């Protein structure tokens, strides 16, 4: 997210006369912006945690070529097809990978990488992002876009996940359960229990099957247990209800 924002912010449209336009960007400017943003965010985290000791910083990236969720739901993120990344995105990402400790696993998104690392370093980590989906990962989450902190328990993370399955995500192009928004999702979970059956019942009421509910759950679920991904075989264990 930070690389995308930094690369996007330095783009400049140039008119060469008449109808000829091109888009230009200076990767060095984007890299400077990236470092400034990272420095500011790290300072906020350390101040909030009242911590002055050593720490590690890991940048997570999505696999740019494959995404296991598209094997589960072919239309996943289909609304982004044809949308170009910022002109210097690739150069800035490579620059970050050359200078920072970075993680990117085949077929996974950056969110999954964070979730797996969160499990590995449980109790000694802070998840930093501007993505609301991180509320489905147990642990300490700093939303730098809104300057908000969350301490999310396993129970709360599971509730947030079940709600997300029903709500869906227009940005990622999975629809969830028709007619259910955030308020309704919270109400049905409070009324009928924070269990998979509650989700299935809502899908069935909408004329959908448990299989369709499971499909939505598998794309909504952010990997957050190390056993969910085999780093040697690059194999994902898809989410299943308990």
Sequence positions of predicted segments:
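Short secondary-structure boundary/capping segments
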Residues: 9-13, 73-77, 142-144
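Conserved phosphate/metal-binding and DNA-contacting active-site motifs used
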Residues: 44, 51, 57, 66, ...
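Non-catalytic, usually N-terminal nucleic-acid engagement modules in DNA/RNA processing proteins
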Residues: 1-58
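Short loop/turn segments at strand-loop or loop-helix junctions that form parts
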Residues: 1-8, 58-65, 70-72, 181
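Extended two-metal-dependent nuclease catalytic cores across DNA- and RNA-processing enzymes
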Residues: 18-21, 52-54, 78-241
């Amino acid at each position: 997210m930070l690389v995308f924002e930094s690369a996007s912010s330095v783009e400049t449209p140039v008119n060469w006369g008449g109808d000829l336009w091109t888009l230009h960007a200076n990767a060095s400017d984007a890299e400077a912006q990236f470092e400034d943003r990272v420095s500011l965010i790290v300072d906020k985290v350390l101040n909030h945690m009242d911590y002055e000791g050593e720490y590690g910083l890991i940048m997570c990236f999505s696999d740019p070529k494959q995404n296991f969720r598209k094997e589960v739901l072919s239309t996943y993120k289909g609304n982004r097809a044809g949308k170009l990344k910022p002109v210097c995105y690739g150069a800035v990402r490579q620059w970050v990978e050359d200078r920072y400790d970075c993680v990117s696993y085949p077929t996974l998104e950056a969110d999954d990488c964070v979730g797996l690392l969160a499990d590995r370093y449980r109790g000694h980590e802070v998840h930093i992002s501007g993505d609301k989906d991180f509320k489905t990962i147990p642990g300490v989450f700093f939303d730098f876009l809104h300057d908000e902190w969350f301490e999310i328990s396993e129970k709360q993370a599971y509730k947030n996940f079940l709600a997300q399955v029903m709500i869906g995500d227009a940005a990622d192009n999975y629809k969830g359960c028709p007619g259910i928004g955030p308020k309704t999702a919270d109400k049905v979970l409070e009324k009928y229990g924070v269990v998979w059956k509650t989700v299935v019942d809502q899908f069935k009421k909408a004329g959908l099957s448990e299989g369709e509910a499971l499909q939505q759950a598998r794309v909504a679920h952010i990997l957050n247990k190390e056993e969910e991904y085999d780093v040697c075989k690059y194999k994902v264990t898809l989410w299943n209800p308990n």
